[in-house]
């Protein structure tokens, strides 16, 4: 009986500290629902070839894929897209994004001086 009381006390303490399993479940359900809506929009906008390319990009670089998805969805919502995005259009969007996010690398080559001492 004392173990049940301890469990109840621990649960009430965790809920008092902001740990609410029901709230976490609701948040997870909301995230999943938003992701499903997002995928539904992308299915309507992208051709099958473009969706396949984007899914391969997601495997390698999820953050880049997310940026492209956001860009495409925003363009569709603002009416900038008049037709479905095909593979060629997706490639051009990827190139534009790559140009914006190119990283500059600097390599320093130091000369070594040989002393004949």
Swiss-Prot record:
Gene3D superfamilies, sorted: PDCD5-like
Ranges of biased composition (kind: Low complexity): 8-22
InterPro entries: PDCD5-like, PDCD5-like_sf
Chain residue ranges for the region called Disordered: 1-40
Keyword annotations of the record: DNA-binding
GO MF entries: DNA binding
GO cellular component, one term: nucleus
Family affiliation: Belongs to the PDCD5 family.
Protein name: DNA-binding protein DDB_G0278111
Organism (species): Dictyostelium discoideum (Social amoeba)
């Amino acid at each position: 009986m004392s173990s049940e009381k301890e469990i109840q006390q621990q649960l009430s303490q965790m809920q008092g500290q902001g740990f609410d399993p029901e709230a976490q479940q609701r948040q997870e359900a909301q995230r999943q629902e938003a992701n499903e809506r997002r995928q539904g929009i992308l299915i309507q906008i992208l051709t099958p070839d473009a969706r396949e390319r984007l899914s391969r990009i997601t495997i390698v670089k999820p953050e880049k894929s997310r940026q492209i998805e956001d860009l495409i969805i925003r363009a569709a919502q603002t009416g900038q897209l008049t037709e479905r995005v095909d593979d060629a259009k997706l490639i051009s969007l990827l190139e534009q994004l790559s140009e914006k996010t190119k990283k500059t690398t600097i390599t320093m080559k130091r000369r070594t001086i040989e002393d004949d001492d």
